[in-house]
Regions:
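Residues forming the flavin
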Residues: 12-184
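Iron-sulfur (Fe-S) cluster-binding segments and ferredoxin-like electron-carrier domains
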Residues: 1-17
């Protein structure tokens, strides 16, 4: 008796805050292996793969469709859960590893996979996330004011709703709110 569960979220937050205060040292990188790798998406998978590949000596470029890197870490997690400064510090650390980040590039439209291989990339990692919601097919789900979790969080986080009333967010809020599912 007398034992309590560990609060993983609080521990992760402590470590992130500590690293933010103390600064992250850029490790020695592996010997260059002369292989270019393109990473599609700058969410958790893309950032992690990019950092690991850079540490192994690969030349890495991230292609991000949005105007800022971070993917779901940026648009899907509210400021009170993941302060943007922590994400910005992590992205800067990855840049210090030599990773290049190109934003506003939609792979498949702006540039194709064949274009990437023609540019000398030996491999492509697709960390594109799960951006498409699953709808239930219920009457009214296509009406104004009905949002998927990702759409709602994107509008909140990318349109600065957390800085309300300085910024007004184009989200229709009704008197009644229904939340279906427990993911986001």
């Amino acid at each position: 008796g007398g034992y309590q569960s560990a609060s993983i979220g609080a521990l992760e937050r402590f470590v992130a805050d500590y690293a933010l205060q103390k600064g992250l040292e850029t490790p020695d990188l592996g010997e260059s292996v002369d292989a270019k790798v393109a990473v599609i998406g700058s969410g958790p998978a893309g950032l992690t793969a990019s950092a690991d590949l850079a540490r192994l000596g690969h030349e890495v470029t991230i292609y991000e469709a949005l105007h800022k890197p971070g993917g779901v870490l940026l648009y899907g997690i509210p400021e009170f859960r993941l302060p943007k400064q922590i994400l910005e510090t992590e992205v800067e650390y990855i840049r210090k590893l030599g990773v290049k980040i190109q934003t506003n590039v939609v792979v498949g439209k702006t540039v194709t996979l064949n274009d990437l291989f023609d540019q000398g990339y030996k491999a492509v990692f697709a960390g594109i996330g799960a951006g498409s919601p699953y709808f239930l097919g219920v009457p009214g789900e296509n009406l104004n004011g009905v949002y998927s979790a990702n759409e709602f969080l994107t509008r909140i986080n990318l349109m600065n709703a957390y800085l309300f009333p300085k910024y007004d967010t184009p989200i229709i809020l009704g008197e009644t709110v229904v939340i279906m599912g427990g993911g986001n």
